[in-house]
Amino acid sequence: MTLTSPFDLTHKTIWVVGGAGYLGQATVKQLYQLGATVHCIDLENRTADFISTLSPSSRLIAHSLDATDMTATEEFVKYQISTSSVPDGLVNMTASTTALKMEALSADDFDRVNHGGITATFMLARWVGEQMAARGSGNVVLFSSMYGTVSPYPEVYEAPMNKNPIEYGVGKAGIIQMTKYLAVHWGAQNVRFNCISPGPFPNPTVQQLHPDFVGRLSQKSPMKRIGRGEEIASSVAFLLSDAASYINGHNLVVDGGWTVW
């Protein structure tokens, strides 16, 4: 008798949107290592640069796409499904922000960020989700943030760092509710929706240039450290796997305990 690990993703096709970012790269690598065929989807230069660092493989496919462009995204979904298949999993890790203080934020700024953070996320989830529902199976992981649940500590964001802006947190709070709604809407069709709320995961550039900021983040965590990229990647892999087959509508908080203070 051959035992198969519930975490094995062999024969699964997974789209990772935002796959060339800091957390996206770790996620693409993890899913690939677990046997999945991974479509890494991101802006043109980011995708090409990242994929060029990896060993060539038929299970690792790069795509260039601005996921905030609704026309391009809908065409991408239709083309990929018509020429290949409906993916088994969709991971949307995209995010944007103005990095502006609240007093300087215009209505257009707010709307632009949340078009990408909420509207574009919803439309992609709907376009792919309805195809998964028609097939009778699927798995979607969206990305929120600890700042979709709590407000930033002002003292952490001393100059030159800008406090995490309001439009980002508002959008990430919306992702949590979107996840719950879609989980109910398509649950009977065996399509699961979950989201992940990362805690402090500053990218390598921030870690290198702003060690004092990283230190303040670490002190606010009960574990007294920032997160590592692979800790998000393994959380994504878990939610996509059969080990999580009865988890639906859940917001998995991966923050080292930040939000339990």
List where the protein language model places each region:
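Short C-terminal tail/terminal secondary-structure segment
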Residues: 2-5, 237, 248-261
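Canonical Rossmann dinucleotide-binding motif of NAD(H)/NADP(H)-dependent dehydrogenases/reductases
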Residues: 6-39, 182
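Conserved NAD(P)H cofactor-binding loop of Rossmann-fold oxidoreductase domains
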Residues: 93-99, 257
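Substrate-binding pocket helix/loop in short-chain dehydrogenase/reductase
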Residues: 101-102, 106-114, 154, 164, ...
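Alpha-helical segment proximal to the catalytic Tyr-Lys
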Residues: 130, 184-185, 245
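Catalytic loop of short-chain dehydrogenase/reductase
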Residues: 141-174, 179-187
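Short, small/polar-rich loop/turn modules that mediate ligand/substrate recognition or access, typified
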Residues: 187, 192, 247-249
